[in-house]
Every structure is written in structure tokens, then in C-alpha cells.
Amino acid sequence: MTDLTSLTLAEARDGLARKSFTALELTEAHLTAIEAARGLNAFVLETPEQARKMAQAADAQIATGDGGPLAGIPLGIKDLFATKDTRTTACSKILGDFHPPYESTVTTQLWRDGAVMVGKLNNDEFAMGSSNETSCFGPVVNPWRRAGSETKLVPGGSSGGSAAAVAAGLCLGATATDTGGSIRQPAAFTGTVGIKPTYGRCSRWGIVAFASSLDQAGPIARTVRDSAILLRSMAGHDPKDTTSVDRPVPNYETAIGASVKGMKIGIPKEYRLEGMPPEIERLWTQGAEWLKASGAELVEVSLPHTKYALPAYYIVAPAEASSNLARYDGVRYGARVNGRNIVEMYENTRAAGFGAEVKRRIMIGTYVLSAGYYDAYYLRAQKVRTLIKRDFEQCFDQGVSAILTPATPSAAFGIGEKGGADPVEMYLNDIFTVTVNMAGLPGIAVPAGADGQGLPLGLQLIGRPFDEETLFSLGEVIEQAAGRFTPKKWWA
């Protein structure tokens, strides 16, 4: 029998429909894989009993022909999504042993469609990080290694657990969130596919907030088709989220294999950074050639405010975070460290509960929102954001269907290698991805090649608002040309 953990989500779905195996068998195979891969630290909570019950329920539905589109599919859930009566911590000590009395909208929709939860996935604390090193549960180890080396690499962040679990065959797909690149960068680092949908496409209700005007949920999966299948279940209007957009959810899977002939693909000159590694440059050129060979037309475009995106992002995101994280005070839920009075209790709780990176961003955010600095920093950053959005609008007004860029400035790096003394070094990982969040656009990262040491590299496609289908069609062209990327198993 085929190793069930090596199947794509689409293959597993078809196999379940044909009754080649049961949902319980599929789930057991993944639970065994999770157990053997604990050294990767991708999961912060395994839920085997719950998974078996959900798989048995899926088998019963499949038997009567009532199975949903994800019936019996084992998924991992980023620990930012509230899961009812199942510990949810955002990988922060401050949430302690929090068991939400409610379920996030996105996970509710996944369970409605028959998916099986195998566990909660590691992430950077409160989704603040680009390497999954800020989690209170410790770093996630990338299933990929450099050729001939045993150095442990980061999987990217903040959705590092999601990307590592999918790459290592521990689940068939995973939920993730993206505030400045937290789906696309880990996908690129692990040879997986990650899509950040248009802002408002997926509900944010029940997801621990980082920066509310930037946060967006999306899937990480092994293939473009798999990510399309997952997004269809995750997306949809939710009256509980005022930023959720009320428009029909298309069947994204129909975009797979659709012709890209005649599509105009923008190549932004501002993304050609000084000191860009030659292998990233080559990959970008190669990706453009693949799209051209499929009938797309390449055009150079200009996004003149790109260079201001990263500094503006690191004002807007911390400002919103400082406001969102004010609610963690030890009073109503989560951890509490007592003091002689209530103010001291707040101080003690927040000092003990938040990690260094979260504290840094709260302080930056509080500073840029403070009297005397608000206009100089926050207001100016919001103006830059408007200009970035306008750059994209002008580009799309010229008939451009999508924009092709690198996903990351490098391949995965070693745990502890970056950002020690200078956090800006770590922040630069988001250089190609933050513009998409600032403009509220959809972006997909697709594995497209490998660096000189055999590590996967990804390309990013940026689309028009609510035109995820075009990204899936173009992404599949790159995927077909580049082939699949699977790490050699060393961890079990």
C-alpha cells in the first residue's frame, strides 16, 4: 500500500472517495508520522483522540455519500486559531493554559466540510517573527537540510510549524496566517505552497490578533491544487468580522490547468535589490520564462514606493499590535503573576508573559502612537501605505494580470543565525512580501527551484483583489515546470 502520508490532499480525497483506504487509516498514518517527527517541534499540541473521533465521523459520512469536500482529510491548525475546549496559546506564556469556549470561523468551516484536526501547530509568539524562533515552545526545525550538513535550519515564520508539518508529511495541509509574509515566506523556505488571500476573504474571527488591518488567514499545502481546495473551505463572509467581504467563494480548483495565454505578467524593477543573491535572480528569470513559454506576456512595471514598504510596515504593524495586546493583563484569562496592587499585577504578568520580540514590538507601537510622534511616524506610514496601494492599482489598470517576484531574499538559514544583535536583519526577510499586506492583495508562494546547497526557493505571484484564481492558474504553471520538492527524511 502507498505511504498515505506521501499523498497530496487531492490524491487522498480521491482515494477516500474510491474507498482505497478509510479516513481512520489515513489519520492513523499521520498520527504515527507526527509521533516520529517530534524532534521537528512542529506541533505544540497533538490531538490523537479527537482526530480519531473526527475520522470515524468522516468515514460514516463517506459511507452514506454525505461526506463534505474535506471529509477525512487530516489538517494541522496554527496555534493562533481558537479551537473550542482545545488549548490555544499563540505560542505565548501569557495565554498559559487557555482553552477557548468558542471555535474560530475558519476552523468551524473546515470541520463543517469534514476535515480532521491532528493537532495545534507551532508559530512565532503572537505571529511576530520570520523564523519561528520566538515561540515559547522553542524553535521549529525545518525538515530540509543543506547538502552534506546537519545544521538545523529555520522553517521561516511566523507559520513555521504549519510549513514544516506539511513539508514533512505530518498533515495534508495546514491553516496559517499572514501579516507581512507569514504564509509565503515559510512556504518558500520549506518547498510548500502558501497563499495569502485578499484581505477580507477569510474571516479573522477567533484568530488571535496581531495587526488587524494586515492579518489574513490562508492555507499551506503541498501543491497549488491542494491550496486551492483548502482556500475554498476557509474563505467566506462572516458577519462576526466587520472586515470580512460578502462575495461568493468560487471553486478555486477549476482554475488549476486553466490557460494563461495572453495574460500580462508584471516584473517590477524595484524588486531587483542591490546584493540580491545570483540564484534568486536566476530563479526569478527562469520563472518568467516558464510563464512566457505558456503564452503569458512579460512586461516591466514600476512600483516606486516599494523601498518604503518595510519601514512603514514596521510602524503600522507594531502600532496595531500594541493596541491588540493591551488586553493581555492577567485579569480575565491566561497566565497571572500577582503583585501588591493591580498595576503591579499588570506589570508582573506582562513582564513574565511576553517574550523579547513581542515586548520590542509593543514598545515600538506604543512609541509611534504616543503624543508628539503620532504624526511623524504612524500617520506618515499610513500615507505611504496609500501610495503603495496606488502603485499596484496603476499597474493593474495597465492590464497587468499578476506580478511575479521572488518570495524571499535567501533560502532557509540556520537556527540562531540571524537577528541576534540586530532585529532589522530578521525583518529584512519580509522585504518581498510586506507590500502585499499593505495593499490588501492576494499573494501566493510556489516552490520553483533550489539553491546551491539543495534548499528550496520560492517565487511569489501577486494578484488583483479577489482574483486568487489567476494566481492558482499561474502558480500551477510554475509548479509543473519546477516539479515537486520533498525533503529527504532524516528525522525519524
Curated annotation (Swiss-Prot):
List of catalytic residues: 78, 158, 182
EC numbers, comma separated: 6.3.5.7
Source domain of life: Bacteria
PROSITE patterns listed in its UniProt record: AMIDASES
GO molecular function: ATP binding; glutaminyl-tRNA synthase (glutamine-hydrolyzing) activity
Any one biological process term the GO annotation gives: translation
Disulphide bond pairs: none
Any Pfam family the entry gives: Amidase
GO cellular component: glutamyl-tRNA(Gln) amidotransferase complex
Keywords for this protein: ATP-binding, Ligase, Nucleotide-binding, Protein biosynthesis
Top-level EC class: ligase
Recorded catalytic activity of this chain's protein: L-glutamyl-tRNA(Gln) + L-glutamine + ATP + H2O = L-glutaminyl-tRNA(Gln) + L-glutamate + ADP + phosphate + H(+)
Annotated family: Belongs to the amidase family. GatA subfamily.
Known partners and oligomeric status: Heterotrimer of A, B and C subunits.
General function of this protein: Allows the formation of correctly charged Gln-tRNA(Gln) through the transamidation of misacylated Glu-tRNA(Gln) in organisms which lack glutaminyl-tRNA synthetase. The reaction takes place in the presence of glutamine and ATP through an activated gamma-phospho-Glu-tRNA(Gln).
The protein, known as: Glutamyl-tRNA(Gln) amidotransferase subunit A
Species the sequence originates in: Rhodopseudomonas palustris (strain BisB5)
